[in-house]
């Protein structure tokens, strides 16, 4: 029983403005839709159901029915979902605008209540006040919101969400923003609305209001790679594939500084209808390069590492070893389709082997060494603390020699030409015979930064940018970077 969805259905018939604003895919005819994946609340119609991906941001936040309108909370077009979306920091003035919008779209007064009651009482059996028949009148005005942190912005999507106790498989989390407003003022608004209802319905309204306005906020969730769909990618088999984003826009571009003012547009119905009549869509091809995706890829690589290779004498690179049960790696995983990860893995393993062999460690593929447990962490460049610890443990394992207060290890074992070039590039054009701790860190990090320079990466993919940000980046030709063209920083 989705209260918000029911309210939109019934209140849509009130006037021309409501008919335009409250149009939901969930209340229209069903059309073929993408397969659902996660359980959660559809941001468009607020019902708890199976969710599919959004074509505007790649997150799972829309139900199969609402997906036909392709609405995203990051759109520029001021549809109902966009007008319910607020950015931090939310002020009391912003909340006043939201509450006024609710009362404009979902009014409750004596005349309206009687109208709804008369339309329900078509037969004798409907003389009772059953909640199913009057669900649309039982939607209180609350400051309940689903919240998500994207890059440097926190977004609050206000609405009336039923079944808060159900399992939430999305990165959105429930937040109560009542502390941003006056509790007594909100109570007064709702008591005034409630006073026009029959006594039986008043009890249910009050119960719903207090349960949705007095709950404790939950902690923010961290985004993960699985929160984003692969369906927006041009080629799902290509590791550098671009992502196709569709955004709903209007001819009068609204500045992001005025983000929280979108809900006030409906106060001038004629102007709002004119704005909505100018709506159109913009399509962008954006890079998938970001820390979130990179961390996910290197996490898989770190679990596939065969550390025994650093003691081996194989002539082939790490990924091309065959017929050796200690060093042969399963290269049929999808992650190895990315040529950049193959290069990084081969180069790092070759360099570490050169350090091990140069410092008198005589071993074999089958050797069991204590340093093995740290080799996989050398690929977790996004986890700075863990990565630094792994490099330090490797360096200390090599038994460095103290020279004038600085510890050094040898590097006199043969390395491949690509590793040699990277070492020269980062060591002033030379291949030094000895390396200190900082030199070792510099070379190992350079092998990763050559393709995935996480120091300058966004935290989340560009699909989570606002429409104005996408438009600006597109003008500067920065939606696609060299990494997607298979060029490294050096090239």
From Swiss-Prot:
Residues 320-491 are annotated as: Interaction with host IRF3. Residues 42-79 are annotated as: Zinc-binding domain. Residues 82-176 are annotated as: Important for cytoskeleton localization. GO terms for biological process: symbiont-mediated suppression of host cytoplasmic pattern recognition receptor signaling pathway via inhibition of IRF3 activity; symbiont-mediated suppression of host cytoplasmic pattern recognition receptor signaling pathway via inhibition of IRF7 activity. The keyword 4Fe-4S does not apply. Plays a role in the inhibition of host innate immunity by inducing the degradation of key host factors required to activate interferon production such as IRF3, IRF5 or IRF7. Associates with components of cullin RING ligases (CRLs) including CUL1 or CUL3, which are essential multisubunit ubiquitination complexes, to modulate their activities. Belongs to the rotavirus NSP1 family. This is Non-structural protein 1. It comes from Rotavirus A (isolate RVA/Human/United Kingdom/A64/1987/G10P11[14]) (RV-A). The lineage of its organism: Viruses, Riboviria, Orthornavirae, Duplornaviricota, Resentoviricetes.
